[in-house]
Amino acid sequence: YQWILAAGRGAGSLGESTRTDLQLFNGAATDSTVTIGFRVARLADGSPAAQVPTATLTVPAGKVVSLPDVVKGLFGLDAAVGSMDVVSDPPVFAFARVTAADSGGGRHGYGSAALLGDSTAAPGSRAVFIQATDAGWDVMESELQLTNPTDGAAQVTVKAFDTEGAAVGSPLALAVGPKDVVRVPTAYYAVAGTGAPIGRLEVVPAEGSQAVFAALLRQDKKTGDADAVVPYIVPS
């Protein structure tokens, strides 16, 4: 199993022209059978999205298969944000490019390489983002996305800190159901209650919770440029 975080089409931080192009590389000596699922994200106060059917394809030995606009092409979705899970035998390497149309021509966006299960935050550890930024709707914004890859429930608390390491605002408790994806737009502001050019966010799974993936999407609201940040996992 591997997971692509922060994929989307026609919605999300990059706007209505967002699309995701996926590439799959099979370095093995035999063909690989690949099954891809898309987990539609919801807002923290929203209901879990309906499950989308998976898609299965073959990646020939030693070849790359490119899937442009994969969220629409494979899953028929016009407007959705979420995560993709990739199951393959033998294993493939997956990489996505998430882009949107640029007013000056071309496209801007970010790359998202597939992650393995050891990149999750589990109970006793925490996922730390030292690059959280919410500096105004027209300057910089950061969106937090949490993915539960398991069949059990997850419960996490999101905490905010200033540049001096002092806790700010009120911790945000979030329930992330089985195979669920939750979005928190302007995440630092949502927790801290105020914006900041530089801040820190921590995602802390509760005792007994399932492990979760976390990703932070930071976007320059003037240029449209963005990056998808994975956290530093502080072990227990």
Please state what every model-predicted region is.
Residues 1-236:
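Gly/Pro-rich, tryptophan- and cysteine-flecked surface segments typical
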